[in-house]
């Protein structure tokens, strides 16, 4: 297990950069924090020259990252991209109008769905290696979009932009891969509370070294949605989000009878299942949600559980005193997300299916799945709470998604990934 990362003051006194070669294989690490108010996640990186710690909203989508570029943005290494250059023309959506000579982009907030027009920028970004040296590795030509403070609405209060972890060639993982000639793959481990940090691991397909005990991943194919769900639609592109081939849902081993046609992404981009950190809880289309809740409540009777008054946004809650605590959370029916084969499933235990609500004299455990209505594009959106303390790998070279069930089964947590010094230094 690598030691905790050195403090920022040590980085400022003497920053050691690796001399990169085409065979560079040391993974890079970035801490992930959870925000109590929004229930969203931020990824910490070093940005600018001199390097400055910066927190960005973690998003499993978007074609490019974006950063607040107000009057306080100063960097000796930043430079704009001219219009009508091969680089500018390669972006999925750009604008070179209003007599501007600078390439402009349309950064988007995935939570509020706000967007705006702002200039593209190139600057330095750095992340530490996940080894004994914790050396900073410099990406000197990191491409992103500028944005104004308006676009930060709805994100964590300390977020200064968005880190795109989507399928795009200009996402953060893709630019790291291109710069270091490393595998186009990254691993996520989201923390379950704001008291701890998780981590993102870049430039490596390995995961066995992350924890003291061996943790195996189960894999399923990533599905390409042919139509992106973006605000700006003048140049339609495939989605940068991650869709998986979910074929059924089981509760306590019993399948729900879902209309299978809506579980497949069609040519207009509707249907299917995606993984999202823009949603705090898993969102189910109304017909699926009703089946899900009915079956869960029925199966809960075997645990001697009786529903009580629900707390928004949840539809089913139980008195906290009625649930038995286990090492994987409250004892409730298991939820299995079944993939391309019956023996390939993502099992969700109580720690990820239930949410504790204790406030105003109320103390309940609520089912952490919400009704998404009937008009959504994607009938199943797996949200952040269901992902916490699970190890996930997004391997674009092999077009596959690797996952575990809760790490608590292995007496492990995402906070074991020892990046607390980095995170504490930039809060």
From Swiss-Prot:
One of its GO terms (molecular function) is aspartic-type endopeptidase activity. InterPro entries: Aspartic_peptidase_A1, PEPTIDASE_A1, Peptidase_aspartic_dom_sf, TAXi_C, TAXi_N. It is found in: Secreted, Extracellular space, Apoplast. Glycans are attached at residues 99, 169, 245, 259, 298, 304. Residues 1-25 form the signal peptide. Residues 41-404 form the Peptidase A1 domain. SUPFAM superfamilies: Acid proteases. Changing residue 416 to A: Almost abolishes the interaction with XEG1. GO terms for biological process: defense response; proteolysis. Its EC number is 3.4.23.-. Changing residue 415 to A: Almost abolishes the interaction with XEG1. Its main location: secreted. Pfam families: TAXi_C, TAXi_N. Keywords: Apoplast, Aspartyl protease, Glycoprotein, Hydrolase, Plant defense, Protease, Secreted, Signal. It is an enzyme of class 3 (hydrolase). GO terms for cellular component: apoplast. Involved in plant defense against Phytophtora sojae. Contributes positively to soybean resistance against P.sojae. Binds the P.sojae xyloglucanase XEG1 and inhibits its cell wall degrading enzyme activity and its contribution as P.sojae virulence factor. XEG1 acts as an important virulence factor during P.sojae infection but also acts as a pathogen-associated molecular pattern (PAMP) in soybean and solanaceous species, where it can trigger defense responses including cell death. Interacts with the Phytophtora sojae xyloglucanase XEG1 and xyloglucanase-like XLP1. Possesses stronger binding affinity with XLP1, a truncated paralog of P.sojae XEG1 which has no enzyme activity. Plants silencing GIP1 display significantly increased susceptibility to infection by Phytophtora sojae, and plants over-expressing GIP1 show increased resistance. Belongs to the peptidase A1 family. This is Probable aspartic proteinase GIP1. It comes from Glycine max. The gene is GIP1.
């Amino acid at each position: 297990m690598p030691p905790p990362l050195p403090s920022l003051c040590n980085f400022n006194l003497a920053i050691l950069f690796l001399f990169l070669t085409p065979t560079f294989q040391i993974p890079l690490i970035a801490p992930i924090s959870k925000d109590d108010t929004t229930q969203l996640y931020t990824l910490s990186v070093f940005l600018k020259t001199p390097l400055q710690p910066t927190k960005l909203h973690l998003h499993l989508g978007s074609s490019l990252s974006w950063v607040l570029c107000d009057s306080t943005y100063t960097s000796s290494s930043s430079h704009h991209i001219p219009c009508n250059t091969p680089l500018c023309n390669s972006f999925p959506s750009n604008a070179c109008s209003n007599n501007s000579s600078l390439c402009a982009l349309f950064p988007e907030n995935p939570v509020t769905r706000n967007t705006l027009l702002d200039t593209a920028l190139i600057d330095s970004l750095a992340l530490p290696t996940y080894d004994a040296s914790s050396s900073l590795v410099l990406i000197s030509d990191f491409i992103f979009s500028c944005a104004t403070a308006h676009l930060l609405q709805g994100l964590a209060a300390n977020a200064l932009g968005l880190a795109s972890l989507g399928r795009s060639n200009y996402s953060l993982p893709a630019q790291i891969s291109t710069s270091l000639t490393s595998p186009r793959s990254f691993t996520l481990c989201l923390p379950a509370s704001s008291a701890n940090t998780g981590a993102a691991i870049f430039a490596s397909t390995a995961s066995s070294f992350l924890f003291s005990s061996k943790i195996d991943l189960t894999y399923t194919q990533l599905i390409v949605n042919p139509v992106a769900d973006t605000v700006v639609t003048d140049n339609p592109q495939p989605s940068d989000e991650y869709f998986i081939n979910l074929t059924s849902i089981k509760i306590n081993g019993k399948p729900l009878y879902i209309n299978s046609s809506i579980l497949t992404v069609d040519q207009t981009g509707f249907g299917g299942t995606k993984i999202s950190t823009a949603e705090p809880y898993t969102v189910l289309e109304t017909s699926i949600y009703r089946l899900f809740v009915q079956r869960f409540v029925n199966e809960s009777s075997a645990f001697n559980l009786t529903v009580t008054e629900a707390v928004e946004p949840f539809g089913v809650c139980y008195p906290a005193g009625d649930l038995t605590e286990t090492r994987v959370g409250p004892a409730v029916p298991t939820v299995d997300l079944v993939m391309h084969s019956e023996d390939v499933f993502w099992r969700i235990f109580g720690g990820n299916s239930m949410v504790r609500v204790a406030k105003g004299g109320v103390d309940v455990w609520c089912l952490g799945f919400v009704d998404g209505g009937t008009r959504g594009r994607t009938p199943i959106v797996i949200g952040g709470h269901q992902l916490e303390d699970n190890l996930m790998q997004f391997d674009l070279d092999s077009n596959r998604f690797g996952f575990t069930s809760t790490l608590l089964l292995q007496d492990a947590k995402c906070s074991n990934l020892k990046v607390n010094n980095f995170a504490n230094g930039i809060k």
